[in-house]
Amino acid sequence: MSTQIPARQETYDPSQSSGTKTPSHPYDGNPTRSYPKRNAGKFTTYSSQMIAPRKRKAWEYEEEEYEASRDFYQRVTSWYDGAVDLAPQLFREQHFPSYDEFYSLGGVNEKFLEAHEEVKAQEQMDSRYLQHGQLPSINMGKQPIIGVIYGPTGSGKSHLLRALISCNMLDPIPETVIFITPEKNMIPPIEQTSWNLQLVEANFDCREDGTIAPKTSTFRPEFMEMTYEEATAPEHLNIDHPDNIYVKVSKRGPVAIIMDECMDKLCSGSSVSVLFHALPSKLFARSAHCTAFYIFVVLHNMAPRTAIGNVPTLKVNAKMHILSCHIPQFQFARFLYAFAHNISKDLVVLLKAYFSFLQQNQRFSWVMYTPDPVSESFRWCSIDQQYSIIPLNVNIQERFLKTAKSIIKFSETHRKQLERNPKLTDLEKLSPPGTFQET
């Protein structure tokens, strides 16, 4: 008696199909048929439509996003190259891929676009204040202003003080300037003449119709000289005293007080802290004609010999710090570590390198720090030799630094795709006929 062995029927597993193989009977690939598959002791069904080969989509991109991101990519890479030139000890030289390669590999992701939008929004907000990429004034309409100017002898402090008024670097310009010195007759006649001339020059402006008219309510701003003892006398520090000189001049219009060569007096004399915080705000609020009140104190050393006195109070209440590029590098570094709390260490090193660059190439430039600016981009500024106020945009540079690091990381991740394949053939140039010589 013979037993007939039935033929083996092959089952079809959709998960192991390559998409091109035609399954055999009884699972013949009918779209309306369901195929059983054993899974953990149970049968489940899969439709043949789930394993149908997908059509490859054509590569699509947004042209506007492509062009806008190109400009931002070039700005970031150019900024990094400049940072390498300024601080090669911190920033290593990098060979960035071309933008087309970066874009084609998916580098323009959400993080990249978010950084681009943040920079764009910040620059749009800053454009409301800028004129040709520069700030029109150092105070940007804020009042009252207490500023400290640091610089050794011969660094151009006197020229800067006169330029603050004559070059329209204050808004509004003062009608009365009180110049305070340690002793009497310390201002040379030539400097007095320069002050009077530049005060008159700054007071007049040419209008569109060709007429020349004063900017203030007076034709000739007043220049007054006082000693330190006179300026800090009790009757002048008391705002309710009838002989207070500051109350009298504030009734005429904007006032500027300049304290020069008084560092020893400030360190060793009695407390005059009321001159640096209470007096300016009260005078500015009391008189309607006093639309501006400025106090500028000149210090020859950023680190006085004693930590007591009026200098620490002055630094705390100062709304503006202007540093000469003639000061030593270690003093600027100490200033950075004391005030630059909101920026990264890499940007601190970059600021130190930029200050060193100014010391070597633009000796009579200045670096200005404002604790409470109208925009975060204007916290750090530079004043060049033409007295142009240029914002350093440290907050935007922070975003450039983060984006540059992400580009570098992206390039390292896709190193194999970015590597150039070696040439399979090498073409050798043949010499023209008749150039071979027999030996």
From Swiss-Prot:
Positions with a binding annotation for ATP: G151, P152, T153, G154, S155, G156, K157, S158
Composition skew (Polar residues), residue ranges: 1-23
GO CC field: host cell nucleolus; host cell nucleoplasm; virion component
Q: Where is this region: Disordered?
A: 1-42
Per its record, what triggers expression of this gene product? Expressed in the intermediate phase of the viral replicative cycle.
Q: Where is this region: DNA-binding?
A: 419-439
InterPro entries, per database record? Adeno_IVa2, P-loop_NTPase
Q: Name one Pfam family in it.
A: Adeno_IVa2
User: What GO molecular function annotations does the UniProt record carry, in alphabetical order?
Assistant: ATP binding; DNA binding
User: Where is the protein found, in the record's own terms?
Assistant: Virion; Host nucleus, Host nucleoplasm; Host nucleus, Host nucleolus
Fetch the SUPFAM superfamilies from UniProt.
Answer: P-loop containing nucleoside triphosphate hydrolases (SSF52540)
Q: Transmembrane residues, as ranges?
A: none
Q: Which UniProt keywords apply?
A: Activator, ATP-binding, DNA-binding, Host nucleus, Nucleotide-binding, Phosphoprotein, Transcription, Transcription regulation, Viral genome packaging, Viral release from host cell, Virion
Highest taxon of the source?
A: Viruses
Question: Which GO BP annotation is one of this protein's?
Answer: viral DNA genome packaging via site-specific sequence recognition
Q: Does the keyword Acyltransferase apply?
A: no
Tell me, how does this one assemble? Homodimer. Part of a genome packaging complex composed of packaging proteins 1, 2 and 3; this complex specifically binds to the packaging sequence on the left end of viral genomic DNA and performs packaging of the viral genome. Interacts with protein 33K.
Q: Which family does it belong to?
A: Belongs to the adenoviridae packaging protein 1 family.
Q: What is the recorded name of this protein?
A: Packaging protein 1
